[in-house]
């Protein structure tokens, strides 16, 4: 029973990319609401950390699904993206919850961890998608939008581009949500195909 539960969690943990990516994509809207209601974006950024955390858990699930078929470059991409997500989560919590930068104003370690983590995440996401095995768990029609979204994220994270940068930030989150959604659709279609095959076999017998 426990083994089946763990197998189920590993198989479908990748779906957490959907809520994580959606929360990420809604960040500019959250910043706007926070500025409008509280006259500061910090209220939103305090609530941002679940987005990268959910994406991290989803990424781990995706990697576990295809770990036996993935090569070294794809595993490197996974590790780089995972490190980036950990840095983003830690930087956000350190900056807005623990107030680390209030004690180290000059070096601002939490802020720099957050910003560097974004770049590392984008680079790792691109490597992870481009090097994913063709016969892996991720459908090709889900990987292409993910690559585009990761490229948009890399541009957005590199410098402040105002409204255009916010749009690219949204596309990065949409790319992760799309990747998780493609996994769900692929799993549902596979389930329907198995049902049809079993029904046809039962009818013949």
Language model feature labels by segment:
Residues 1-205:
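Hydrophobic, aromatic-enriched alpha-helical segments typical of multi-pass transmembrane helices
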């Amino acid at each position: 029973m426990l083994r089946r539960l763990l197998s189920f969690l590993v198989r479908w943990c990748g779906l957490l990319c959907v809520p994580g990516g959606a929360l990420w994509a809604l960040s500019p809207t959250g910043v706007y609401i926070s500025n409008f209601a509280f006259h500061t974006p910090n209220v939103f950024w305090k609530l941002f950390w679940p987005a990268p955390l959910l994406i991290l858990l989803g990424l781990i699930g995706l990697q576990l699904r295809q770990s036996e078929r993935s090569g070294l470059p794809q595993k490197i991409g996974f590790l780089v993206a995972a490190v980036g997500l950990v840095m983003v989560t830690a930087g956000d919590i350190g900056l807005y919850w623990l107030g680390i930068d209030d004690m180290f104003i000059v070096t601002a370690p939490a802020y720099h961890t957050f910003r560097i983590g974004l770049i590392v995440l984008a680079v790792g996401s691109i490597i992870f998608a481009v090097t994913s095995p063709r016969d892996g768990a991720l459908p090709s029609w889900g990987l292409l939008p993910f690559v585009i979204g990761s490229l948009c994220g890399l541009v957005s994270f590199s410098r402040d581009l105002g409204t255009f940068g916010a749009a690219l930030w949204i596309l990065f989150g949409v790319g992760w949500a799309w990747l998780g959604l493609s996994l769900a659709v692929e799993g549902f279609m596979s389930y329907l195909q198995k049902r049809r095959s079993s029904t046809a076999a039962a009818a013949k017998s």
